[in-house]
């Protein structure tokens, strides 16, 4: 299948633009994220990518090209960062594939209305890239209810989430990917669920640690002991239309870096100019690959290749951003002192954040192993 926009997509694009212009009337604060999700829900813009089996759960059905149009226009409008995307793009498709009818009816409409927010409980201090090393447990108590005990880390949006989908070990003594289950845990359990923000080197706290101390979990998706299958199915969803949205953001960042180079005169350096041109060309290539994959033309290793390209590209852009500014890119404002914190500028924030691009979501080393072992058929890495 080749990916190509349809003639009818022009009308849909205009509808999206008009709606966004009418509703993006004031800046959306972090506290307003929930309100914006509900606004999106009322507009019918949540769940566009859910498959046809989701009909009747409150979402609007859209073609693949319409999903891309929505994602592109949302990014171009500089609309607020989503706080409901984990439920919409990860949990909902997982429930459609593995959930019971009762689970779909309970959770999908609330996600489509923008009323319930989710976070993901996968990584642990000793199980990040090696997800099969999960130690969090879920055991039945005296009443037969499952209680979750353990720690998750790097959990985005945990402070705002109503629910967390958790990969936990339900078979005592099980090893690796055996004996795991996929559980849905309510976050509002004082004394049983604790969220601690993680301060990053950029000064922000986008990630959290989550501690479960006998937290109740009555919902299990995909059957007991089948958590690995469900978890891997969910991870495959983390690549797709959202990649195109990310690339539009990358293009805006690249434009700002180029403007800085022009304004400062750094663009007269032929080596730096060549690096900027290469960034532009590689971004165009990534977009083509993303559209090709969405059209069904990518091979089994396409998601891993895309992750490698994206992480390296963004990291190099961050390095360029501070290099272009020269010494000013490495120091704070004139009134900085060792005892007074200062706000990082845009280039510094970009540089510091992009150091993580080759790590989160599966490190470069993991992606190369996947390509080598699962696509090229090379021997497994010795352990």
Q: Model segments located where?
A:
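A short, Trp-centered hydrophobic/proline-enriched beta-strand micro-motif
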Residues: 114-122
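A structural signal for short hydrophobic beta-strand segments in well-ordered beta-sheet cores
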Residues: 136-139
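Glycine-rich beta->alpha junctions and the first turn(s) of the following alpha-helix
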Residues: 3, 193-286, 357
């Amino acid at each position: 299948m080749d990916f190509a926009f349809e003639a009818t997509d022009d009308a849909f694009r205009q509808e999206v633009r008009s709606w966004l212009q009418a509703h993006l009337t004031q800046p959306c604060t972090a506290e307003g994220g929930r309100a914006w999700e509900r606004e999106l829900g009322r507009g019918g813009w949540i769940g566009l990518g859910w498959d046809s089996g989701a009909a009747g759960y409150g979402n609007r059905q859209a073609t693949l090209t319409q999903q891309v149009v929505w994602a592109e226009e949302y990014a171009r409008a500089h609309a607020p960062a989503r706080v409901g995307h984990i439920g919409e793009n990860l949990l909902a498709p997982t429930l459609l594939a593995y959930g019971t009818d009762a689970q779909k009816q309970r959770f999908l409409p609330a996600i489509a209305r923008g009323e319930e927010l989710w976070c993901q409980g996968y990584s642990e201090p000793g199980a990040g890239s090696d997800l099969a090393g999960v130690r969090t447990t879920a055991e039945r108590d005296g009443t037969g209810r499952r209680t979750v005990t353990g720690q998750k880390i790097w959990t985005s949006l945990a402070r705002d989430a109503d629910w967390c989908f958790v990969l936990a070990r339900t078979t005592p003594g099980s090893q690796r990917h055996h004996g795991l289950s996929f559980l849905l845990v309510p976050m509002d359990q004082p004394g049983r669920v604790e969220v601690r923000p993680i301060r990053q080197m950029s000064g922000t706290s986008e990630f959290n640690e989550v501690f479960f101390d006998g937290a109740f979990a009555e919902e299990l998706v995909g059957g007991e002991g089948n958590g690995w299958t469900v978890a891997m199915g969910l991870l495959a969803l983390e690549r797709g239309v959202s990649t195109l949205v990310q690339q539009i953001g990358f293009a805006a960042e690249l434009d700002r870096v180029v403007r800085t180079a022009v304004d400062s005169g750094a663009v007269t350096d032929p080596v730096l100019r060549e690096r900027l041109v290469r960034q532009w060309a590689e971004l165009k290539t990534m977009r083509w690959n993303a559209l090709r994959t969405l059209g069904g033309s990518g091979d089994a290793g396409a998601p891993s290749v895309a992750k490698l390209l994206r992480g390296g590209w963004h990291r190099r852009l961050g390095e360029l951003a501070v290099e272009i500014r020269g010494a000013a890119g490495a120091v704070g404002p004139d009134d900085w002192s060792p005892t007074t914190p200062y706000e990082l500028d845009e280039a510094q924030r970009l540089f510091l954040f992009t150091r993580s691009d080759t790590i989160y979501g599966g490190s470069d080393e993991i992606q190369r192993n996947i390509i080598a072992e699962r696509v090229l058929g090379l021997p497994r890495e010795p352990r």
